[in-house]
Design a protein with these regions (language model features):
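Phosphate-binding site recognition
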Residues: 1-118
Length: 118
């Protein structure tokens, strides 16, 4: 099966990056939010000056991230000083009090936040 690059949507996300905003992709289930987030992750990973922090709450490897404290610990463990840190969280609504994390890391320099939710 061939993957479809959703360039117009990626371009819109790119335009919003660097503008001190939190990018939120919302919509009904199964419309491609997760796929778009993975495309963004793959695109940003091509640049070695970027650090990607990716959480996919639909994957069992992230089951231990249940609340904002768990998410903070995961992010802190994976952040890299001196690089542009991209915090990408898929299905963020599954993390209790996630808003606290989002507000906190929004203030961090060299940090971009893109999240999805249904």
């Amino acid at each position: 099966m061939e993957n479809i690059i959703r360039k117009p949507y990626l371009d819109k996300i790119e335009q919003a990056l660097g503008k001190d905003v939190i990018i939120v992709l919302v919509g009904q289930r199964r419309i491609g939010k997760s796929y778009l987030l993975r495309q963004l992750k793959d695109e940003k990973a091509k640049d070695s000056s970027n650090n990607i922090i990716f959480v996919d709450k639909e994957k069992k490897e992230f089951d231990d991230i249940r609340n904002y404290r768990d998410l903070n610990a995961f992010i802190d463990e994976h952040r890299v000083e001196g690089k542009k840190n991209y915090i990408l969280v898929d299905e963020i609504q599954d993390i209790m009090e996630f808003e606290r994390t989002v507000r906190s890391y929004r203030e961090e320099p060299d940090t971009e936040i893109v999240i999805t939710g249904s």
